From Swiss-Prot:
One of its GO terms (biological process) is chaperone cofactor-dependent protein refolding. It is found in: Cytoplasm. It comes from Beutenbergia cavernae (strain ATCC BAA-8 / DSM 12333 / CCUG 43141 / JCM 11478 / NBRC 16432 / NCIMB 13614 / HKI 0122). Belongs to the GroES chaperonin family. This is Co-chaperonin GroES. Its main location: cytoplasm. The gene is groES.
Length: 98
C-alpha cells in the first residue's frame, strides 16, 4: 500500500493493525473493552534526524515492517479517508519478526 504522506526527520507513518475481536477462548470482545492498538505496519519513513555534527541518522525500521509502539505515542491523522498514526522513531519499541 503506497501512501502519499512523506514524513519529516525521524518520523514514521504507520497503519494501525486492528485489535483482536475475540479472546483465545473464543469470547467476543466488545468495542468498549478493547485497548488502543500498539501494533502497526510501517507505510513511510522520514530521512532520519540530523545529529549534533550535522550527520543524518537513519531510522531503524523499513517500509513494510510491523512495529510495536508506545501506547500513547504518535499523532493520529486522517488523510484521504484513511486513518494513520505518525510516530517519532523514539516511540517505536520493537519490530515484529515473522
Amino acid at each position: 500500500m503506497s501512501v502519499s504522506i512523506k514524513p519529516l526527520e525521524d518520523r514514521i507513518v504507520v497503519k494501525t493493525l486492528e485489535a483482536e475481536q475475540t479472546t483465545a477462548s473464543g469470547l467476543v470482545i466488545p468495542d468498549t473493552a478493547k485497548e488502543k492498538p500498539q501494533e502497526g505496519e510501517v507505510l513511510a519513513i522520514g530521512p532520519g534526524r540530523v545529529d549534533d555534527n550535522g550527520n543524518r541518522v537513519p531510522v531503524d525500521v523499513a517500509v513494510g515492517d510491523v512495529v510495536i509502539y508506545s501506547k500513547y505515542g504518535g499523532t493520529e491523522v486522517k488523510y484521504a479517508g484513511q486513518e494513520y498514526l505518525i510516530l517519532s522513531a523514539r516511540d517505536v519499541l520493537a519490530v515484529v519478526q515473522k
